[in-house]
Amino acid sequence: VETSVQRNPAVRAAIAPPKDRNKIRKEAFQLRKQLGLPRDASVDIVSLLELALPVIDPSFNLLPVPDKELSGRYAETRPYEHAIYVKESVYDAAIRGGGQARMILAHELAHYLYHSPREISFAYVNRNERLDSNVDPERQADIFAAEFLAPSGELRGLSVSDVQRKFGVSALAAKNQLRQASNIARRHASKKKRRSGPKA
């Protein structure tokens, strides 16, 4: 007799404590505030990881390594070593201001800060069913990276190219953040309309 597990093969997935986009956005803002970074300023992510984060966590190290040592990966966070390993090519691109490389480092920063081994669990899930996005650590790290580097609340009136240039993020991240900024503006307008009530 074929079981449901045989019909729907399971895959192993990492599970993080649930966080929605609003909570992650607040965490990104709080980190900027803790580091003394204005909300509308570009973040020098390399200097932050090499100089600022070790002040908060003296045991932390950003470790560029030859590309061949991270085959198939751009970077890897190892919380138990208090380190983020990054391909030299990605590190060099981030120093030059490459948007994707900067996003990769900010993504790994999120893993380091919020996804310690104590907080991550693993489960076998049905590969045909979508995992709740609020517990997906990769999605959480993607959102954090975008909100930390290009806060959605600071993008009013900007184009995709404006966001890329001002905040140093990839085109995809800029588009996604502008979409989030538009969603926030609509929600605020809707709340304001409800508070004002019907006009006489």
Map each language-model feature to its residues.
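Active-site hotspot residues in diverse enzymes, especially metal/ion-binding acidic/histidine motifs
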Residues: V1-A200
